A protein has these predicted regions:
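Short acidic/glycine- and proline-prone juxtamembrane loop motifs at membrane-interface regions
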Residues: 111, 117-125
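Membrane-proximal, lumen/periplasm-facing interface regions of secretory-pathway glyco-
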Residues: 298, 323-380, 389-420
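Transmembrane-helix signature of polytopic, membrane-embedded enzymes
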Residues: 5, 86-108, 127
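Membrane-interface transmembrane helices that cradle and orient dolichyl/undecaprenyl
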Residues: 91-97, 132-148
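Membrane-interface alpha helices of multi-pass inner-membrane proteins
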Residues: 102-103, 147-163, 198-199, 238, ...
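Hydrophobic/aromatic-rich transmembrane helices and adjacent perimembrane loops
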Residues: 42, 254, 274-275, 284, ...
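Transmembrane-lumen/periplasm boundary regions of multi-pass, lipid-linked membrane glycan transferases
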Residues: 18, 157, 169-273, 279-294
Length: 428
């Protein structure tokens, strides 16, 4: 075992232990409580996304009870798995040294470091995205179907976690077009076997939507602001890019831009670099394009940074070999990222206003539930109706005995709660 492998393992193991400890120090955020509700209503699909995250939460809560730790347990393990996948991919493409620094970047990047504790969709689908990227790199040199089928399975689980997992197929196709030796797979059953296997995972999605009137398509159109009149809003594009710089860390994002826009800055293996570009650009450009209408949320392009961070590690490792005077810039970038990540794990000492505190959404739900419970005792109200799905989910988790909570029925439905039995049905 090389020293780089050993130290990467130490970082991943220590990070996992710390995150398991830290996971109970924050209240649930709205998304986590919402997906926890899914796990209490098993189904083959849900309005927003596929069922994979609900499966993980169901197993976690079966092991550790209906608790914050039970919900977040697999988030921490999946994040560790993603780190392992990043190391294996970077080592296969470049070297142990680049792989080590790729793990370091992922561990200290705010988007990955903070997200590794929360049981969100991104934590799940990035795990499958990372290993699909690893198996496809092996598959491209194979004529046998086993690696192609495995890649299709991983893409399938990625899509059942978040539908944008399908964009990785576009990444693979783009690489195949760019890389002449890989073009042969377009004339053989290998590439299409991968597509077929991945497509089979969408069968439960289609069945569920057929039973419910295809609400997912309406939800996705609304979510992407595609139901609004088309506009070009430069400020929204700027907002998207600023958000990306914030969640990656400004200097690391600057380093990523240099790695992509200045190929001669540091020479790295052409084919391997092209593969990382193909992993990054399709997903990133999709959300950049959508931001001309409305800026996406900061985390939506997260999977693109699996390839992006490895490319940064490869380019800047080589750059330091030929330009040692840039070491100060690398140290500054690492320092800023570590500082930002550290602050994001505990912000109470900063006394930030609610709108500026990134952890504000992970506080207050327990107190709100206590006040609601007291109000129910005084008034005799039998159930709770919330105006937002995250509020309804959080109250369901934190109220005594974790009762069902409800929302006003909307048409078309834009969250899963309104598709379940309503308060009129359960409390006539």
């Amino acid at each position: 075992m090389s020293p780089y492998t050993l130290w990467a393992a130490v970082i991943l193991l220590a990070g996992t232990i710390l995150r398991l400890w830290y996971s109970t120090h924050l209240e649930l955020v709205g998304d986590e409580a919402y997906y926890w509700l899914w796990s209490r209503h098993p189904d083959i699909c849900y309005l927003d996304k596929g069922p994979v995250i609900a499966w993980f939460i169901w197993v976690g809560t079966a092991l550790f009870g209906q608790t914050v730790f039970g919900i977040r347990f697999f988030a921490v393990l999946l994040a560790c798995g993603t780190g392992i996948g990043i190391y294996l991919l970077a080592r296969k493409l470049f070297s142990d040294k680049v792989a080590f620094w790729s793990v370091v970047l992922a561990a200290m990047t705010p988007l990955f470091a903070v997200g590794a504790t929360l049981m969100t969709i991104d934590t799940v689908y990035i795990f499958f995205w990372t290993f699909a990227a690893l198996t496809f790199w092996q598959a491209k040199d194979e004529e046998k179907l086993r690696w192609w089928i495995l890649t299709g399975i991983l893409i399938g689980f990625s899509m059942l976690s978040k539908y944008t997992g399908a964009i990785e197929l576009l990444s693979f196709g783009a690489f195949g077009v760019w890389h002449p030796p890989s073009r042969r797979h377009f004339r053989r059953p290998t590439f299409y076997a991968m597509l077929l296997v991945a497509a089979l995972f969408l069968v439960p999605v289609l069945i569920w939507n057929w039973r419910h009137g295809f609400p997912t398509s309406q939800f996705l159109v609304h979510r992407g602001a595609l139901d609004e009149r088309a506009h070009i809003r430069p400020l929204e594009v700027f907002s998207f890019l600023a958000q990306q710089a914030g969640v990656i860390s400004p200097l690391l994002f600057f380093g990523l831009i240099i790695a992509f826009c200045w190929p001669r800055f540091a020479r790295t293996a052409k084919i391997e670099t092209g593969y990382l570009v193909s992993l990054f650009l399709p997903l990133f450009l999709l959300y950049l394009f959508l931001s001309f209408q409305k800026a996406s949320q900061a985390n939506w392009a997260a999977a693109a940074y699996v390839g992006g961070l490895i490319l940064v590690a490869a380019k800047w490792t080589e750059a330091l070999r030929t330009r040692p005077h840039l070491r100060w810039l690398v140290i500054a970038g690492v320092g800023v990222a570590l500082l930002e990540t550290g602050i994001l794990h505990e912000t109470s000492w900063l006394h930030l206003p609610g709108g500026l505190d990134p952890l504000d959404r992970a506080r207050g739900s327990r107190d709100l539930a206590a006040q609601i419970d007291e109000l129910q005792r005084k008034t005799g109200a039998r159930f709770v109706i919330a105006n937002k799905y995250m509020t309804a989910a959080l109250l369901s988790f934190y109220l005594p005995d974790q009762p069902d909570t409800f929302m006003p029925v909307s048409s078309p439905p834009f969250n899963q709660i309104v598709l379940w039995p309503t308060y009129r049905t359960k409390h006539p």
